[in-house]
């Protein structure tokens, strides 16, 4: 199926390469797109993935991962064995918690959230979120300029209680 769709284009399809074959292909590539596993990956790497992932990490100049770097648990951010070290990760629909947790930031590189369809926001607002990303722009109204003569007791205090049943 992939071979038919890429016929006549400068795309090479190689199924099940050895480490040596993969290193030759990586050496010829400007960019390596990592789409080995998806968001459901958990546990330890098995052959041939335990051979390919180190080869990509050692030989590729530029790696872009799709959704999450292969080898990373998308829910926890934990890497059990090895994981693709991406320069950039393009995650779909919404950022995954694992990209921001545990080992995730070390392996994900720059994060880009790609939309899969135009009316994404309408559907995603109806879904219970496990977490929400707070960015600097979200805090502007909370941190209005203060008078120069203010002291620490004039603005109140903060108590944060956080956690969940899923991530105690």
Give short role names for the model-derived ranges.
Residues 1, 99-168:
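Small-residue (G/A/S/T)-rich helix-start motifs and N-terminal tracts that mark the onset
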Residues 1-124:
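Glycine-rich phosphate/dinucleotide-binding loop and adjoining beta-alpha-beta core of small-molecule
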